[in-house]
């Protein structure tokens, strides 16, 4: 239906998403959609940081609406060009799902979010390939400490990062059930995907999977999910 590949990179905080997205886009000659900075203009985000139970739903729905608009416009703008998205819509679903496990969403709020998510994304092309940068909580905490971003160090404790990783597994399974090909890159076992050798391997996998029939399932396409 489309003449371009849509590749989305997902993963926990500190798993290397942004670095891999930039290098992979360059490697594939693709348009890069970097991680958005909607948190800077989301009117509900600072409120949610102060009272997550009260404001998380409004904040997450605002993020979802803007990310859907962004990807729709991006796909309208490209002509026969591959697109690599850092985080994007699947990460909106991941964050919202983590609110449920963390107790910031009620079951009713999660069902409402899900129904709105399904409606807003109904006519948005699904990615051909999603790359899931899988890493343990201990590993990403170490990366967060190394890069020293004050907001992350303050707000991203072990419990929060664990809820994100569990929700990433949920999103990966959901995407696969919808026919999306998922490459799982084990950051600790395989190393950062941004090294020259690993980037070459990852680009090769994506190119192969983008032309693989829906019924095919290469052994590395969904490792352990």
Range-by-range predicted roles:
Residues 9:
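Hydrophobic anchor at the beta1->P-loop junction of P-loop NTPases
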Residues 26-66, 96:
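Conserved substrate/cofactor phosphate-moiety recognition/catalytic segment
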Residues 55, 59-125:
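Glycine-rich phosphate-binding loop used to anchor ATP phosphates in small-molecule kinases
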Residues 141-225:
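NTP-dependent small-molecule kinase module
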Residues 12:
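P-loop (Walker A) phosphate-binding loop of NTP-binding proteins
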């Amino acid at each position: 239906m489309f003449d371009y590949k849509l590749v989305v990179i997902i993963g926990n905080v500190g798993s290397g998403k942004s670095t891999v997205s930039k290098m992979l886009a360059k490697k594939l000659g693709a348009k890069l959609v970097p991680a958005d900075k909607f948190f800077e203009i989301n009117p509900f985000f600072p409120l949610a940081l102060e009272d997550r139970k009260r404001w998380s739903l409004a904040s997450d729905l605002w993020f979802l609406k803007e990310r859907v608009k962004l990807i729709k416009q991006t796909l309208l703008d490209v002509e026969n060009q591959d697109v690599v998205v850092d985080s994007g819509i699947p990460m909106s679903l991941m964050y919202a799902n983590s609110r449920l496990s963390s107790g910031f969403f009620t079951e009713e709020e999660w069902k409402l979010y899900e129904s709105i998510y399904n409606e807003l994304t109904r006519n948005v092309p699904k990615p051909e390939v999603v790359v899931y940068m899988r890493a343990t909580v201990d590993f990403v905490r170490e990366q967060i400490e190394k890069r020293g971003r004050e907001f992350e160090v303050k707000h991203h404790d072990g419990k929060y990062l664990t809820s994100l990783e569990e929700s990433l597994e949920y999103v990966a399974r959901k995407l696969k059930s919808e026919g999306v090909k998922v490459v799982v890159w084990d950051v600790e076992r395989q190393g950062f995907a941004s090294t020259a050798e690993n980037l070459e391997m990852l680009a090769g996998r994506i190119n192969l999977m983008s032309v693989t029939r829906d019924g095919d399932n290469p052994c590395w396409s969904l490792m352990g999910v």
